[in-house]
Amino acid sequence: MSKFSFTIHSNYKKARSGVITTAHGKIRTPTFMPVGTRGTVKAMLTESVVETGADILLGNTYHLMLQPSAERIAYLGGLHKFMNWDKPILTDSGGFQVMSLSKLRKITEEGVSFRSHINGNKYMLTPEYSTEIQYLLGSTITMALDECTPYPSTFEEAKTSMNLTTRWANRSRDAFVKREGYAQFGIIQGSVYKELREQSVKDLVKFDFDGYAIGGLAVGEGQELMFKVLDYVSDFLPQNKPRYLMGVGKPADIIGAVSRGIDMFDCVIPTRSGRNGQAFTKYGTVNIRNSKYAEDKAPLEYDCKCPACTNYTKAYLHHLVRIREILGPMLMTWHNLTYFQNLMSRIRAYIKLGKDFDFVN
């Protein structure tokens, strides 16, 4: 079994390309992780996700702990076997979903108490329990429990939240069972305040996490402010550890973040957009529902190798989506995930060549 490691092969300004080696295989970076919230990437067979070029998936601890339960997944051989995926899986801590329950949850020093949105059952998600759940799932990369600081927050509110995240990170690290090829990432908080972000990095680096995620962004602050935060946070972070920007997936945001030293991304945008009839292409987005595509004989993209582009026209995809045929969202999702993996492949190639990669419309 391979040890967990991160090797940077090429640099271009702040951008890096390399390989993360794990117990479940290698991850080419920069990388985009399709979101498999409940143990499936919506509208996709697992083997189809492989064909898009994805190296790693994201699973959601909150949803999986409720249905079918971490214990049941462990009994059935772990999340990899359960969903027939033999590549790396990163699981979030469940914190973001729990925090978003608002009226159904309460935050204390111990953790977050909440009621299930499914049946009202009460749970307490602590740093230790979140880490245990992810262990039972068999996650390749486990995330420490954090409090996702809302935006906007005052300096004092952000500081209080950041300090709680630091204490939870310490407990998460203590609870993590170290195994060869497996990893745990800490999550940097501090809202939009440079002083707090720097302090958060200093605090979490003491726990020697295997990688570091940047949380609390893409929550309403806008691209300009997000990039401003990334400009200085990347200078604070260790150069030899992977950096993960959580929940960011717009192509222009990915390119801007990679140029600021980010290695990993996840987002529901490609799958959600696909189900809603929106396709990403090198020439901009296509709303396939639009009547102008009703007799369009061209594919979404001529040089895309996905089944939607190699086998079907825009007119056919328009027809499927308009009549709400289930094949429509499946093909649109397959195309979008392929687009995102092609985007990451192009970015990696440009970094290796030492060229600018601002090629998103």
Curated annotation (Swiss-Prot):
It holds the Pfam family TGT. Binds 1 zinc ion per subunit. Its EC number is 2.4.2.29. Gene3D superfamilies: Queuine tRNA-ribosyltransferase-like. One of its GO terms (molecular function) is metal ion binding. The keyword Zinc applies. Homodimer. Within each dimer, one monomer is responsible for RNA recognition and catalysis, while the other monomer binds to the replacement base PreQ1. This is Queuine tRNA-ribosyltransferase. It comes from Rickettsia typhi (strain ATCC VR-144 / Wilmington). The gene is tgt.
